[in-house]
Amino acid sequence: MDIKNFANLWINSWNSHNLEDILSHYADDIEITTPMIKTFTSGEDTLKGKEAVREYWGRALEKVPDLHFELYDVTYGINSVALYYQSIMNKKAIEVMFFNDEGKVKRMHAFYTD
């Protein structure tokens, strides 16, 4: 997998605000853990399954119509990538993503600055 290409496609998907394009990078059994979940819901900090993630990200895109990410750097590991980027609410973010055998993200952990 070309990690830099993945990173650019991922950023462009988010900046397009096209939910289906965003979700195309993720496995059906995706598990995401991020403190932003509590910002946009009253639930847990982890969501499981593409449908739960679709609902959450759909609401988030509605609440942040001017969402625009700027990629700063990309690092990689074994079947994984970490993206460092400018996120929403003037925060910098690092997302660590782990890929399944099909090259889809199966697990993601997000970290943000204050």
Question: Language-model segments: what does each one mean?
Answer:
Residues M1-D29:
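Short acidic-aromatic low-complexity motifs
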Residues M1-N5, N15-S16, T46-K48, T75, ...:
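Alpha-helical interaction segments
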Residues F6, N18, Y56-W57, A93:
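Hydrophobic alpha-helical segments typical of transmembrane helices
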Residues W10, I22-L23, I30, G49, ...:
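Hydrophobic pocket/interface hotspot
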Residues S13, A27, I32, T46, ...:
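Secondary-structure boundary/capping motif
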Residues A27-Y72:
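A solvent-exposed, acidic/Ser-Thr-rich amphipathic alpha-helical stretch
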Residues G58-D114:
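A beta-strand edge to alpha-helix "cap/lid" segment located at domain peripheries
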